Amino acid sequence: MRRILFNSSNTVVLAHRGLWGKYAGIPDMPENSRGSLQIANDQCMDGVELDVKLTSDGVPVLLHDYNLGRTTTVWQQHPGVKYDPLTNQGVNPSILVTPWSQVSQLFLLTPDRRTTTGYHVPRVDELFTYYKQRQLRTPMVFDIKDAKTVRAVNSAANKVFGAASASYVAAKVNATLYTSRSAYQADGDGMVGIPVFTTNMLGKINVRQTIGAWLSTGEAMEINVKQLGGQLQSDADFVRERDVRVGVFQAIPDGPRASEFYKNNGECCYKLSDLFYGKDTADNRGSLDYIERVEAFGLITTDDPKTAIAYLRARGKHD
């Protein structure tokens, strides 16, 4: 975990949603599955970033969307038909109103959604137990959107890993949720917090002040500068000048059509231009050349980590 958190001459790469699908060389491997964590470990990824949501009864599970239709067999539990992201029709209940007793019965779909896999939606506590029993080594970073989920994942990590939690588990959290490291630590005392800054936060918080309130430990931050000289550029430079690792999300489309991304309810789709805020006029984060050569980000979260690592190695930026 220290390799992820602290700055060095090497750039570190996180496998987004684990190592899954075509990026793993296993087309049927589902995202955010126990298998995607195992494969990332087996293929020696620097780390993984996994998404967490809470069931209606407070069980933290791996899931990217707030709804179950895109990635699971939830239509088999309800009257209706399999969810179609293109039409936004079919069975697609929210995870927030679905108890673990129902979620536990669901299977994950293959990335192309054509076939059911043998993988269930993973509980985070059971994933930690699996990790420990199998003696996995790949650090786990969790993308967490609310304080209740931070507390739930932190509790699960402490129960399985104890005082060593911070060696295995970290949480990415929006800087609007926790505007200081001390505020985060009140909920996430066992796992390191990585604050995430995006341009749409500029109208909600004082970004530079918030960065200052997270700087004390010198641990990594994600600052999503979309274009050279764009919004957040001076903030990313401010952090780099203090020898703190600055991360970015590589925006690789995951939708069924070119340049499109699934929405967080599973519906298709949006384009990066739909998320422009204020003075944004471009989003170049899909380009490794922009990420490494232009902006020199030190931490990359990407669906295609093997390509990123090969790119970095060719430039002497990865072991």
Regions found by a protein language model. Name each.
Residues 1-319:
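Phosphate-group recognition and catalysis centered on beta-loop-alpha active-site segments
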